[in-house]
Amino acid sequence: MPLSLGAEMWGPEAWLRLLFLASFTGQYSAGELETSDVVTVVLGQDAKLPCFYRGDPDEQVGQVAWARVDPNEGIRELALLHSKYGLHVNPAYEDRVEQPPPPRDPLDGSVLLRNAVQADEGEYECRVSTFPAGSFQARMRLRVLVPPLPSLNPGPPLEEGQGLTLAASCTAEGSPAPSVTWDTEVKGTQSSRSFTHPRSAAVTSEFHLVPSRSMNGQPLTCVVSHPGLLQDRRITHTLQVAFLAEASVRGLEDQNLWQVGREGATLKCLSEGQPPPKYNWTRLDGPLPSGVRVKGDTLGFPPLTTEHSGVYVCHVSNELSSRDSQVTVEVLDPEDPGKQVDLVSASVIIVGVIAALLFCLLVVVVVLMSRYHRRKAQQMTQKYEEELTLTRENSIRRLHSHHSDPRSQPEESVGLRAEGHPDSLKDNSSCSVMSEEPEGRSYSTLTTVREIETQTELLSPGSGRTEEDDDQDEGIKQAMNHFVQENGTLRAKPTGNGIYINGRGHLV
């Protein structure tokens, strides 16, 4: 009766403490506990704390006591698993600690910690009491991962022409600290900074760029990596760069189509911008003609008349800037010859210009060719004169050699020494010239040249020259003025003052 009374007086917590203290007594044996050094769980998931005793087959596990080891508070009871009385849990962990679902091994002392939170991180101890081996204990660390929840914040409005500007920033906080990067084809720079908290760390990454219209509409993606995530988290931001392109007008590519009576003529204003631009059409020299319709960027005309001629202005604007583009429309009247395009005249002018260019080119070619041939002729003439001079000098030397040797003088030359009868010689030469045939003159001249060449070869090159020889050379030079060289022979120049000596045709 007193034992039962005492049992009634003790509450469940007292029995838990008693059993937990009893689990720390025993003796050492050869069995071992199978546990993990670190148990990792994601925030909100269930954490399994493993503790399995592996010993002899005849050994029995009496109880398994779980406690949390706190550096500040010491050992704090968590739960007690008894082979006979079942599981007893500390009221602080009521409904959070339980056994794994069946089937369960009697040697398995593992427990489940439901809905793990960051406060559950820490060191846990498992102590197993066996019979007859005694008690065994092991410690493990519970790590709770806190996945980050990234957020992306766009920077200030981007405008074309700005310098380096913040495009967006991405922040992620978790435990441990997450990794934040950027995925984009846009050229820019990124920088990161981190902040540490008691149970987590926050990382913020910023992306800077120089805005341009090519970046408008491009994706900028923040990528967050963390061990608590099954895959990277991505947040995409579409860049919006404010710009306004230059304006232009299309529709006047062929001015000849703008004639009186044409229907469906339009002018279209072309431009791009962010935000999308607005269009406005005006006429520079007055209001828009009646019947002209404005529909956004397009200006539509009724059947054309000469009144539609004028200067039209397209005005493009958005919140950033404005642009203008103007064109001149001239509506042609086919019945007015003054305004028709004279294609024939234009063709004639073009042909005339081409012909003039070709003529100028031909003149240049002719002048260049004439100068070239003139220069070549001068060179040939100069060369010919040099050769002729050399030939004359050789002939003079041969004649001199022929007359200086008295043994080589023919008998027919005796008549030349009769200095007292010049008149008779002159008369005879005149008669002889009139009576001789051309063939005789050619033969006699060739004979004389051959005789001179033969006698020149017989002379000694080392013979000295006297003053008398020089006088004779001068006379021979004067006599050679009456000869002409043709085809390697000397021919007498046709003159009435020539002296014919003998019948062999020697002219002096």
From Swiss-Prot:
Alphabetic keyword roster: Cell adhesion, Cell junction, Cell membrane, Disulfide bond, Glycoprotein, Immunoglobulin domain, Membrane, Repeat, Signal, Transmembrane, Transmembrane helix
Signal sequence segment: 1-30
Pfam assignment, any one: C2-set_2
Region Disordered, annotated ranges: 398-445
Compositional bias per record (Basic and acidic residues), positions renumbered to this chain: 398-410
Localisation per UniProt entry: Cell membrane; Cell junction, Adherens junction
Keyword Transmembrane annotated: yes
Bilayer topology annotation: Single-pass type I membrane protein
Residue stretches making up the Ig-like C2-type domain: 147-236, 247-330
Residue span, Ig-like V-type domain: 31-143
GO molecular function, one term: receptor ligand activity
Disulfide bonds: C51-C126, C170-C222, C269-C314
Record-stated family: Belongs to the nectin family.
Described purpose of this protein according to its UniProt entry: Seems to be involved in cell adhesion through trans-homophilic and -heterophilic interactions, the latter including specifically interactions with NECTIN1. Plays a role in the senescence-associated cell size enlargement via SFK/PI3K/Rac1 and thus promotes senescent cell survival. Also participates in the innate immune response by acting as a ligand for the receptor TIGIT to inhibit NK-cell activity.
Description of how the protein assembles with itself and partners: Self-associates. Interacts via its Ig-like V-type domain with NECTIN1 Ig-like V-type domain. Interacts via its C-terminus with AFDN. Interacts with TIGIT.
UniProt protein name: Nectin-4
Species per Swiss-Prot/TrEMBL record: Mus musculus
